[in-house]
Amino acid sequence: MSSVESSPISRYEDEVFPLSFSNVAFEPPMLSHSPDRSTYADDFSQSYQQELLTFPLSYPIVDESECTHTKDKTDSNIITSTEDDCMFDMEFNGNAASAVAAASKESNSASGFAFASNDAFANVAQQNYRLWLSSV
C-alpha cells in the first residue's frame, strides 16, 4: 500500500523539479556572469598602485609660524633607517647614503615642532581627513 501512495507524489515531484544534467535546459546562474575574483583583485591593486604613483601620500603642509620649536627629549621613539627599510621595503633608484641623510635631517626637523594652538592641529587633522576621504 505504501508503493501506491508514493507513486503520485513521485510523479508530482518529477513535474515540479525536473532532473536534467544538460546545460541547454537552464540558463547559467547569475554568479557565472560576475567578474573573476583574481582579475578583479589585480585590477584593483593596479589602480591603487597607479593612484599612489600619481598622487603620493604626503605630509600635511604646515606653516612654521603655527609651530613652536621644542627640544627633543629622547631619540627612542625615532625609527632608525635599518628598521624602516625592513618594514617598508621599496624599490629605490638612487644613492642610499644621501637618502638616509635626507630622511634623518627631515625627521629631526619635523620632530622638533609642536603645534602652537589647537586650531593649527585641527586644521592639519581636517586636511588629512579630507585627503583620506577623497581616496576612499
UniProtKB/Swiss-Prot annotation:
Compartment(s): Preautophagosomal structure membrane
Swiss-Prot/TrEMBL induction comment: Expression is dramatically increased under nitrogen starvation conditions and is regulated by the transcription factor GCN4.
GO BP terms: autophagosome assembly; autophagy of mitochondrion; cellular response to nitrogen starvation; cytoplasm to vacuole targeting by the Cvt pathway; macroautophagy
Signal sequence bounds: none
Membrane topology category: Peripheral membrane protein
Alphabetized UniProt keyword annotations: Autophagy, Membrane
Region (ATG9-binding): 127-136
One Gene Ontology cellular component: phagophore assembly site membrane
Phenotype reported upon loss of the gene: Reduces the autophagy flux induced by nitrogen starvation as well as the flux of the cytoplasm-to-vacuole targeting (cvt) pathway.
Function, as annotated: Involved in both selective and non-selective autophagy. Does not appear to play a role in determining the size of autophagosomes, but rather influences their formation rate. With ATG9, plays a role in the delivery of donor membrane to expanding phagophore.
Subunit structure: Interacts with ATG9.
Other comment: Present with 450 molecules/cell in log phase SD medium.
Domain remark in the UniProt entry: The C-terminal 10 residues are required for the association with ATG9.
Name of the featured protein: Autophagy-related protein 41
Primary gene name: ATG41
